[in-house]
């Protein structure tokens, strides 16, 4: 895969009889360009031109995919776009894809990896798969997350007392 392409969403199954597909975007406030990429069966990037998008309904339609059968050929694939199309972030702001898989350190000792981000509540939580095989949740706030280094793919944390005994 080209290094400058980033997975920003996913195409799910077909919807209706006109070739529409259900989809989701992982990046907030991002508008899809006219051309996106998916990986084909050989894991090669394939460009697709968007015909219509309905973000409220979560539906997308691509040019030359006019039937459910044709649309099914590209269902259940990640959506890739060039990284330079992503909105620029401020200091101490990160895209979720930058944090997933990041090494987590406490007192300079590797304690796990970020497995995912849960932002369904009033604040975001890091879901960390620790080296002791336990999965722990940590509020993604400055009090506990001391440093995030995207280039080195690591973060330093200072979890609350008792966090390791959970």
Curated annotation (Swiss-Prot):
Entry annotated with the keyword Cytoplasm: yes
Keywords: Chaperone, Cytoplasm, Ribosome biogenesis, rRNA processing
One GO molecular-function entry: ribosome binding
Keyword Cytoplasm: yes
InterPro entries: PRC_barrel-like_sf, PRC_RimM, RimM, RimM_N, RimM_N_sf, Transl_B-barrel_sf
Any one GO BP annotation for this protein: ribosomal small subunit biogenesis
Main localization, broad class: cytoplasm
PRC barrel domain ranges (all copies): 91-163
SUPFAM superfamilies, A to Z: PRC-barrel domain (SSF50346), Translation proteins (SSF50447)
Pfam families documented for this protein: PRC_RimM, RimM
GO CC terms, sorted: cytoplasm; ribosome
Compartment(s): Cytoplasm
Parts of the chain that traverse the membrane: none
Complex and partners: Binds ribosomal protein uS19.
Matching NCBIfam families: 16S_RimM
Note on domains (UniProt): The PRC barrel domain binds ribosomal protein uS19.
Family of the protein in this entry: Belongs to the RimM family.
Protein role: An accessory protein needed during the final step in the assembly of 30S ribosomal subunit, possibly for assembly of the head region. Essential for efficient processing of 16S rRNA. May be needed both before and after RbfA during the maturation of 16S rRNA. It has affinity for free ribosomal 30S subunits but not for 70S ribosomes.
Name of the protein in its database record: Ribosome maturation factor RimM
Organism: Sulfurihydrogenibium sp. (strain YO3AOP1)
């Amino acid at each position: 895969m080209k290094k400058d392409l980033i997975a920003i969403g996913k195409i799910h199954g077909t919807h209706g009889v006109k070739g529409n597909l259900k989809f989701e975007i992982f990046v907030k406030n991002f508008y899809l360009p006219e051309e996106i990429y998916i990986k084909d069966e050989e894991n090669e990037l394939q460009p697709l031109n968007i015909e219509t998008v309905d973000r409220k309904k979560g539906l997308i339609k691509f040019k030359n995919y006019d039937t459910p059968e044709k649309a099914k050929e590209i269902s259940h694939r990640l959506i890739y776009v060039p990284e330079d199309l992503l909105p620029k972030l401020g200091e101490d702001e990160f895209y979720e894809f930058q944090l997933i898989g990041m090494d987590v350190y406490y007192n300079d000792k590797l304690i796990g990896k970020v497995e995912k981000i849960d932002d369904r509540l009033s604040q975001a939580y890091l879901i960390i798969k620790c080296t002791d095989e336990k999965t722990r949740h940590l509020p993604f706030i400055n009090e506990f997350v001391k440093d995030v280094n995207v280039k080195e793919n690591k973060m330093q944390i200072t979890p609350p007392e008792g966090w390791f005994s959970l």
